[in-house]
A protein has these predicted regions:
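Basic, polyanion-binding surface patches
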Residues: 1-183
Length: 183
């Protein structure tokens, strides 16, 4: 059941000291009721390079991808979701520019929110970042990319790559839990 709780498919980006990276997150939600002080909450894998960059810089950007053209969002999904930024520059293949926080803003996104980290909640394998919204915009009209779009368009090879990355993240989370329990 928990796998059905995906929010819209979102890309999360961060940069620090000339290095930029991004990932696909399953959770990005509003985190405050007050419109005069908007906040966003996102979940990202603790083992990811993007996690390190976001914490080091104190900022991140979340992007909604567009359902149309689906090929553009699938390319972003594959690049940010299937590869490791520790071994390659994932954003080299994606058009972007720096935002007001320094976080990369994806040019082909439907829209984005930039935030400065206000707090964190650590899990064994993930961190929840709470961010004070610094900027944001809808770049164009259209429907956002959903997990249903992903399921409808990924190939068997894509799913195998996704599952392999997921297995790595699960193993890292299990090791972190074992260390925490041992302490």
């Amino acid at each position: 059941m928990l796998e059905e709780l995906w929010s819209p498919v979102a890309a999360l980006t961060a940069a620090h000291r000339g290095r930029a990276n991004g990932l696909i997150t399953s959770t990005a939600v509003t985190a405050d009721l007050l419109p005069e002080s908007p906040r966003i909450a996102v979940v990202l894998a603790r083992a990811s390079w993007t996690h390190e960059l976001a914490l080091a810089s104190g900022a991140f950007a979340v992007h909604l991808l567009a359902a149309d053209p689906v090929e553009v969002s699938l390319a972003i999904f594959r690049t940010l979701g299937f590869r490791s930024g520790r071994t390659e520059e994932k954003l080299a293949e994606i058009a972007w520019h720096p935002g007001v926080t320094g976080a990369p803003l994806l040019d082909d996104a439907l829209g984005y929110v930039e935030a400065r980290i206000a707090g964190t909640l650590e899990g064994d394998g993930v961190t929840v970042l709470i961010g004070d919204v610094a900027a944001g915009a809808r770049l164009r009209e259209g429907r956002h990319f959903t997990i249903e779009d992903v399921r409808a368009h990924l190939t068997r090879e894509d799913w195998a790559m996704w599952e392999a990355r997921r297995a790595e993240e699960l193993e890292q989370a299990r090791r972190a839990r074992a260390v925490r329990i041992a302490e």
